């Protein structure tokens, strides 16, 4: 049954083929020499293998052995031709399969070249090695960047150290370390840094005031003048930030005012200027003011006075509670150690509130300046900053004049007590001197 089906399929296949010449032999195929024993035919294509087999068989067939008078022999020959064609097809398929590994190796080489790279000596690197080399290059690049940043940081620190040394010398020459704080070693590191930063801030403030004065004299537009005014406002914000840092590190250095000039310390209120007094001084300098501006400035002055009074009362209560904590209990030499420790712990807890009061005072000063900026025009605000800067400059100049006054006459007459007549003359001269007040 299987043979008949194969015969039927081959007959159908032969029906579709065109007629061929009867050149096939009648003897069995076992007498034919198979040409596929050569290794070169295996590597060839299917069409070339089929052509070589056909030519070899054509050379072996003799024309005298053909029989054309029998239809059965013709069918056998056609079946034989189908068998040979099938053989040739299988032979070409085997050759294709044999050549497949070489093609796969070639494709693998292409994939390796795709995912790898070639070194200078011509050797091919795989993807893992290339990735490791890329990671090493990236790590080396980051290391160089860190080294460069470290060198720049060292250079910046060296320059900053030189600036601090120069500012220390300038501070010593100006007498900024009087009294018990005659040397920076007697102060905390935060106090020394604030003194240096405050000296730098004064220098920058002088430059800012000079720029603002030049802008007003040149009659610059409000846009350009407003940029300079905003820069001055940021300059004061920087000062308040420095004071906040000092309050958190050494509030006693801030409240004593040793960073300020001697004449400035006479007018300090909670380690700074009193906002209501500054507003009272600035209002006459701003004529003419509109009615709305005048009402705004007076309202700001009144609210500042109320806040100042509240802060002063709170600070007084803190001082009283601190004195009660320190002076509580017996003060003799035989005091109880446990009682002493408890009193000191209570005093330390209340002393921590001292920082908040000075922070609130600085917040009041900062808010007063910003609120004044919203009330006034750009040119009026510029004149306010100039007035504040000139006022502080005069106080510092007065301190320098007082420190550099001649003292020989005072030393010569230090041990001489005045007589009655001389005392009357001194009293009369003092009355004439202060008669204007």
Curated annotation (Swiss-Prot):
Transcriptional regulator involved in defense response. Gene3D superfamilies: 1.20.5.170. Pfam families: bZIP_1, DOG1. Residues 33-75 are annotated as: Disordered. Residues 51-75 have a biased composition (Polar residues). Belongs to the bZIP family. Residues 126-170 form the bZIP domain. Residues 154-168 are annotated as: Leucine-zipper. Transmembrane segments: none annotated. Residues 128-148 are annotated as: Basic motif. Its main location: nucleus. Keywords: DNA-binding, Nucleus, Plant defense, Transcription, Transcription regulation. It is found in: Nucleus. One of its GO terms (molecular function) is DNA-binding transcription factor activity. It comes from the Eukaryota. Interacts with NPR5/NH4, NH5.1 and NH5.2. One of its GO terms (cellular component) is nucleus. The keyword Transcription applies. GO terms for biological process: defense response; DNA-templated transcription. This is Transcription factor TGAL5. Residues 191-405 form the DOG1 domain. The keyword Transcription applies. Residues 37-50 have a biased composition (Low complexity). The gene is TGAL5. Signal peptide: none annotated.
């Amino acid at each position: 049954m299987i043979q008949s089906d194969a015969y039927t399929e081959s007959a159908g296949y032969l029906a579709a083929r065109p007629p061929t010449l009867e050149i096939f032999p009648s003897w069995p195929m076992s007498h034919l020499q198979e040409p596929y024993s050569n290794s070169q035919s295996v590597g060839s294509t299917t069409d070339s293998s089929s052509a070589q087999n056909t030519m070899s068989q054509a050379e072996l067939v003799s024309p005298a052995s053909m029989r054309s008078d029998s239809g059965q022999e013709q069918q056998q020959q056609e079946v034989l031709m189908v068998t040979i064609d099938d053989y040739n097809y299988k032979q070409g398929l085997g050759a294709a399969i044999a050549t497949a590994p070489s093609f796969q190796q070639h494709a693998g080489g292409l994939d390796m070249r795709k995912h790898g790279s070639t070194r200078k000596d011509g050797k091919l690197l795989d993807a893992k090695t290339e990735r490791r080399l890329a990671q090493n290059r990236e790590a080396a690049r980051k290391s160089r960047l860190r080294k460069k940043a470290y060198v720049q940081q060292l250079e910046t620190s060296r320059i900053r150290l030189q600036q601090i040394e120069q500012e220390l010398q300038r501070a010593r020459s100006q007498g900024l370390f009087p009294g018990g704080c005659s040397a920076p070693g007697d102060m905390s590191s935060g106090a020394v840094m604030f003194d240096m930063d405050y000296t730098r801030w004064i220098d920058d403030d002088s430059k800012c005031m000079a720029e603002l004065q030049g802008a007003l004299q040149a009659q610059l537009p409000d846009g350009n003048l407003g940029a300079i005014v905003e820069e001055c406002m940021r300059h004061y914000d920087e000062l308040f930030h420095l004071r906040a840092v000092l309050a958190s590190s050494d509030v006693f250095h801030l409240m004593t005012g040793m960073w300020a000039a001697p004449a400035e310390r006479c007018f300090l209120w909670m380690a700074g200027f009193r906002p209501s007094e500054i507003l009272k001084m600035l209002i006459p300098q701003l004529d003419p003011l509109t009615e709305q501006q005048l009402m705004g400035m007076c309202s700001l002055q009144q609210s500042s006075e109320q806040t100042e009074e509240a802060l002063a009362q709170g600070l007084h209560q803190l001082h009283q509670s601190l004195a009660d904590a320190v002076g509580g209990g017996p003060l003799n030499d035989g005091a109880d150690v446990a009682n002493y420790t408890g009193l000191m712990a209570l005093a330390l807890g209340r002393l921590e509130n001292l920082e908040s009061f000075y922070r609130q005072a600085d917040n009041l000063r900062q808010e007063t300046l910003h609120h004044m900026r919203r009330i006034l025009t750009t040119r009026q605000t510029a004149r306010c900053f100039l007035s504040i800067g000139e006022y502080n400059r005069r106080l510092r100049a007065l301190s320098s004049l007082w420190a550099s006054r001649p003292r020989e006459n005072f030393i010569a007459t230090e041990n001489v007590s005045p007589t009655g007549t001389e005392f009357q003359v001194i009293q009369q001269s003092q009355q004439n001197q202060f008669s204007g007040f």
